[in-house]
UniProtKB/Swiss-Prot annotation:
Transmembrane segments: none
UniProt name for this protein: Copper chaperone CopZ
Entry keyword set: Chaperone, Copper, Cytoplasm, Metal-binding
One of the record's GO cellular component terms: cytoplasm
Coarse class of the protein's main subcellular location: cytoplasm
Classification lineage: Bacteria, Bacillati, Bacillota, Bacilli, Bacillales
GO molecular function, one term: copper ion binding
Entry's Gene Ontology BP terms: copper ion transport
Function: Chaperone that serves for the intracellular sequestration and transport of Cu(+). Delivers Cu(+) to the copper-exporting P-type ATPase A (CopA).
Binding residue positions for Cu cation: C13, C16
Domain HMA, chain residue ranges per copy: 2-68
Localisation: Cytoplasm
Gene: copZ
Alphabetical list of Pfam families matching this protein: HMA (PF00403)
Amino acid sequence: MTQKIIKVEGMSCEHCRNAVESALAKLNGVSSAEVNLDENHVRVEYNDSKVTFENMKEAIEEQGYDVK
């Protein structure tokens, strides 16, 4: 498993947290996603042979947030 911290702009509440975590959890290969609202990032644990950073970036951006 690979772990990555992705900086995300625009998250400010529980709805934001749930939207990002749910979008990432739906991706095949993501085993966990945990948003930290104070730090504006999400920590993702995933299988890099099944899912790419670009896949995760797209899933987050589709929810209306910016990946930095």
